[in-house]
Protein backbone atom coordinates (compact mmCIF):
# COMPACT_ATOMS: atom_id res chain seq x y z
CA UNK A 1 0.00 0.00 0.00
CA UNK A 2 2.97 2.30 0.48
CA UNK A 3 3.87 2.25 -3.18
CA UNK A 4 5.04 5.33 -5.02
CA UNK A 5 2.20 6.70 -7.16
CA UNK A 6 2.76 6.55 -10.89
CA UNK A 7 2.97 9.69 -12.95
CA UNK A 8 0.40 10.17 -15.69
CA UNK A 9 2.96 9.66 -18.45
CA UNK A 10 4.13 6.38 -16.92
CA UNK A 11 0.52 5.25 -16.54
CA UNK A 12 -0.22 6.03 -20.18
CA UNK A 13 2.71 3.87 -21.30
CA UNK A 14 1.40 0.88 -19.33
CA UNK A 15 -1.05 -1.54 -20.80
CA UNK A 16 -4.71 -1.49 -19.79
CA UNK A 17 -4.48 -4.74 -17.80
CA UNK A 18 -1.78 -3.28 -15.54
CA UNK A 19 -3.81 -0.10 -15.07
CA UNK A 20 -6.84 -2.20 -14.13
CA UNK A 21 -4.80 -4.17 -11.55
CA UNK A 22 -3.55 -0.93 -10.01
CA UNK A 23 -7.11 0.40 -9.85
CA UNK A 24 -8.33 -2.80 -8.15
CA UNK A 25 -5.46 -2.60 -5.65
CA UNK A 26 -6.34 0.99 -4.75
CA UNK A 27 -10.04 0.14 -4.35
CA UNK A 28 -9.16 -2.85 -2.14
CA UNK A 29 -6.86 -0.70 0.02
CA UNK A 30 -9.55 1.96 0.39
CA UNK A 31 -12.12 -0.67 1.35
CA UNK A 32 -9.80 -2.16 3.99
CA UNK A 33 -9.11 1.31 5.40
CA UNK A 34 -12.86 2.00 5.60
CA UNK A 35 -13.45 -1.28 7.47
CA UNK A 36 -10.53 -0.79 9.87
CA UNK A 37 -11.31 2.84 10.71
CA UNK A 38 -13.87 2.23 13.51
CA UNK A 39 -11.50 -0.14 15.31
CA UNK A 40 -8.58 2.30 15.13
CA UNK A 41 -10.24 5.72 15.27
CA UNK A 42 -13.78 5.08 16.47
CA UNK A 43 -13.18 6.75 19.82
CA UNK A 44 -13.10 10.09 18.01
CA UNK A 45 -16.82 9.84 17.23
CA UNK A 46 -18.00 9.46 20.86
CA UNK A 47 -19.26 12.61 22.53
CA UNK A 48 -17.58 14.21 25.52
CA UNK A 49 -20.57 13.41 27.79
CA UNK A 50 -20.25 9.70 27.04
CA UNK A 51 -16.54 9.78 27.74
CA UNK A 52 -17.01 11.52 31.10
CA UNK A 53 -19.90 9.33 32.33
CA UNK A 54 -17.67 6.61 33.75
CA UNK A 55 -15.33 8.99 35.54
CA UNK A 56 -15.58 9.58 39.26
CA UNK A 57 -15.58 12.91 41.04
CA UNK A 58 -12.15 14.24 41.94
CA UNK A 59 -11.01 13.13 45.34
CA UNK A 60 -10.34 15.61 48.11
CA UNK A 61 -6.64 16.35 48.54
CA UNK A 62 -4.84 14.52 51.30
CA UNK A 63 -3.56 16.61 54.20
CA UNK A 64 0.16 17.22 54.07
CA UNK A 65 2.17 16.07 57.08
CA UNK A 66 4.17 18.64 59.02
CA UNK A 67 7.85 18.44 58.07
CA UNK A 68 10.68 18.55 60.60
CA UNK A 69 12.61 21.81 60.79
CA UNK A 70 15.76 20.38 59.19
CA UNK A 71 13.80 19.58 55.99
CA UNK A 72 12.94 23.21 55.25
CA UNK A 73 14.97 25.19 52.73
CA UNK A 74 17.07 27.95 54.26
CA UNK A 75 16.65 31.48 52.91
CA UNK A 76 19.06 32.49 50.17
CA UNK A 77 22.06 34.53 51.27
CA UNK A 78 22.95 37.60 49.18
CA UNK A 79 25.44 37.10 46.36
CA UNK A 80 27.64 39.97 47.57
CA UNK A 81 28.55 37.86 50.57
CA UNK A 82 30.20 35.21 48.38
CA UNK A 83 31.23 37.02 45.18
CA UNK A 84 33.49 40.06 45.35
CA UNK A 85 33.16 42.44 42.41
CA UNK A 86 36.31 44.50 41.95
CA UNK A 87 36.06 48.04 40.57
CA UNK A 88 36.90 48.46 36.90
CA UNK A 89 39.89 50.56 35.85
CA UNK A 90 39.20 53.53 33.58
CA UNK A 91 38.62 52.89 29.89
CA UNK A 92 41.81 53.44 27.82
CA UNK A 93 42.02 56.61 25.76
CA UNK A 94 43.02 54.97 22.46
CA UNK A 95 40.81 52.77 20.32
CA UNK A 96 43.62 50.24 19.87
CA UNK A 97 43.91 49.80 23.62
CA UNK A 98 40.15 49.41 24.00
CA UNK A 99 40.10 45.87 22.61
CA UNK A 100 40.96 43.48 25.39
CA UNK A 101 41.65 46.15 27.99
CA UNK A 102 39.92 44.22 30.77
CA UNK A 103 41.61 40.92 30.04
CA UNK A 104 44.98 42.67 29.98
CA UNK A 105 44.72 43.48 33.70
CA UNK A 106 45.82 40.39 35.65
CA UNK A 107 44.11 41.50 38.86
CA UNK A 108 40.69 41.89 37.24
CA UNK A 109 39.74 38.78 35.36
CA UNK A 110 42.32 36.16 36.11
CA UNK A 111 40.85 32.71 35.51
CA UNK A 112 43.75 31.05 37.25
CA UNK A 113 42.82 32.53 40.61
CA UNK A 114 43.92 29.67 42.85
CA UNK A 115 46.41 27.75 40.72
CA UNK A 116 48.07 28.07 37.33
CA UNK A 117 47.44 25.81 34.37
CA UNK A 118 50.61 23.85 33.64
CA UNK A 119 50.32 22.47 30.13
CA UNK A 120 52.82 22.52 27.34
CA UNK A 121 51.88 23.32 23.76
CA UNK A 122 50.10 20.43 22.08
CA UNK A 123 49.78 18.22 25.17
CA UNK A 124 46.07 17.70 24.60
CA UNK A 125 46.61 17.01 20.90
CA UNK A 126 49.17 14.32 21.76
CA UNK A 127 46.70 12.69 24.16
CA UNK A 128 44.28 12.44 21.25
CA UNK A 129 47.05 10.91 19.09
CA UNK A 130 46.80 13.67 16.51
CA UNK A 131 49.60 14.00 13.94
CA UNK A 132 52.24 16.66 14.51
CA UNK A 133 50.76 18.75 11.68
CA UNK A 134 47.60 19.18 13.77
CA UNK A 135 49.47 20.84 16.63
CA UNK A 136 49.72 24.57 16.01
UniProtKB/Swiss-Prot annotation:
It comes from the Eukaryota. Its main location: other. It is found in: Cell projection, Cilium. The keyword Protein biosynthesis does not apply. GO terms for cellular component: cilium. Pfam families: LLC1 (PF14945). Signal peptide: none annotated. Keywords: Cell projection. This is Ciliary microtubule inner protein 1.
Amino acid sequence: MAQKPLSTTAAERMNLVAQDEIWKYRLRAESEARQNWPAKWGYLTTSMKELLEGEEEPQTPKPKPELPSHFYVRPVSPMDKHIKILPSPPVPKTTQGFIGWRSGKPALYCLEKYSEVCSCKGAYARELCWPEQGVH
